[in-house]
């Protein structure tokens, strides 16, 4: 079981529990990690970002996606406030759907070194074409239950 929560003053490196400025770019954003108290157990963590936003690198128009991030943690967990700030930093970032989705997955994997990670980027149509992007690291640890991401393929009105 977890120990007594620390006060922010005891965790000076974390953004959690303190006022921080919104990062303006993904490169500027800091992803915090915290020790996994269940590191000896294989299990799954899921983050859902149904209102992810970035900018088209050509037109500057907003692009919208439903992101699903699943990972089997190792020694580290992603701290969720820092993930929220990192994802929000894409609001003023111009990149194609594929680049955004894969870059997010790679950055998280680099920071926390999970046993396994996958990201699904379900992008809303631009120019009449929805784009879904999927990326993962290696193989899922044996015995870890991974539910379907459950985001339906875009059908429009037809």
Curated annotation (Swiss-Prot):
Identification of the protein by name: NADPH-dependent 7-cyano-7-deazaguanine reductase
Binding-site list for substrate: 78-80, 97-98
Phylogenetic classification of the source organism: Bacteria, Pseudomonadati, Pseudomonadota, Alphaproteobacteria, Hyphomicrobiales
Keyword Oxidoreductase set for record: yes
Organism: Rhodopseudomonas palustris (strain BisB18)
UniProt EC number: 1.7.1.13
Function: Catalyzes the NADPH-dependent reduction of 7-cyano-7-deazaguanine (preQ0) to 7-aminomethyl-7-deazaguanine (preQ1).
Region (Disordered): 1-35
Domain of life: Bacteria
């Amino acid at each position: 079981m977890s120990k007594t929560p620390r006060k922010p003053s005891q965790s000076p490196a974390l953004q959690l529990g303190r006022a921080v400025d919104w990062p303006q770019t993904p490169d500027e954003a800091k992803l915090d990690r915290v020790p996994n108290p269940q590191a000896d157990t294989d299990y799954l963590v899921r983050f859902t970002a149904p209102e992810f936003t970035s900018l088209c690198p050509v037109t500057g128009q907003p692009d919208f996606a439903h992101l699903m991030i699943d990972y089997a943690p190792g020694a580290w967990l992603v701290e969720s406030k820092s993930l929220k700030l990192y994802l929000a930093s894409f609001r003023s970032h111009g990149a194609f759907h594929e680049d955004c989705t894969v870059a997010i997955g790679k950055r998280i994997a680099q920071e926390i070194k999970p046993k396994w990670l996958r990201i699904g980027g379900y992008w809303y149509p631009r120019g009449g074409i929805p784009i879904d992007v999927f990326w993962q690291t290696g193989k899922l640890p044996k015995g870890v239950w991974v539910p379907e991401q459950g985001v339906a393929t875009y059908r429009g009105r037809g």
